[in-house]
Amino acid sequence: MSDQFSNAQHQLDALGLRCPEPVMMVRKSVRRMDDGETLLIIADDPATTRDIPSFCEFMDHTLIASQTDATPYQYLIRKGL
């Protein structure tokens, strides 16, 4: 895991969950965070490669990094822009 991912302030394990559960859990987790805090999401649902970037764009959060070459996928988001 790169330093970028290991420095996340919060982590969400969405392994084994299928659409729409991962994004619902991300939304719930982000709601409890302060603006500027980061969340590492670990998932294996291929739909997250589309859903998490779309969620960030729609909800005005920043997708800092993603690793989707192999499972488990990793996404690092920051609450707010």
Swiss-Prot record:
It is found in: Cytoplasm. Pfam families: TusA. The active site is at residue 19. InterPro entries: Sulphur_carrier_TusA, TusA-like, TusA-like_sf. GO terms for biological process: tRNA wobble position uridine thiolation. Transmembrane segments: none annotated. One of its GO terms (molecular function) is sulfur carrier activity. SUPFAM superfamilies: SirA-like. One of its GO terms (cellular component) is cytoplasm. Keywords: Cytoplasm. The keyword Lipoprotein does not apply. CDD domains: SirA. The keyword Iron-sulfur does not apply. Sulfur carrier protein which probably makes part of a sulfur-relay system. Belongs to the sulfur carrier protein TusA family. This is Sulfur carrier protein TusA.
